[in-house]
């Protein structure tokens, strides 16, 4: 039987196949450690579950260079934990709060304690996201979200969904969405 860490590693691998993420990308992660442990969201926050999931996410970050943003719970209006340098580089405004298990959630609190120089920001526009336990990360994704199906549908007992974003297609019937020979003929 797979551990929750192994399950998350599988999910991350599936996301990477669908949308290769790198150091230029931002990944939002929403987690209910209660749901992972088989309890109702917000009722049984677990540091141990958070630590296991963080290990997989940190390993993924080390391999890909992707920036991580951990969504807090609704008590903090789903604000996010990020590294200060990433938040500043992206122009995100810091807010004055520190997550704790009962107001922020175990996952965001754990990430806050592990980051080098953590800050909390109110909102972001991430390139991709993973939602473990139906925490509703969509408000932090760039438009247009493209759902990604994983080979597994749960981490522990928590339902898992993923998405990456793509640029909006604009222009109508005469618009072109791929480079053509015509583009090459305009090169000098």
Swiss-Prot record:
Lineage: Bacteria, Bacillati, Bacillota, Bacilli, Bacillales
NCBIfam families attached to this UniProt entry: TIGR01440 family protein
The protein, known as: UPF0340 protein BH3766
Gene3D superfamilies: Hypothetical protein TT1679
UniProt record similarity statement: Belongs to the UPF0340 family.
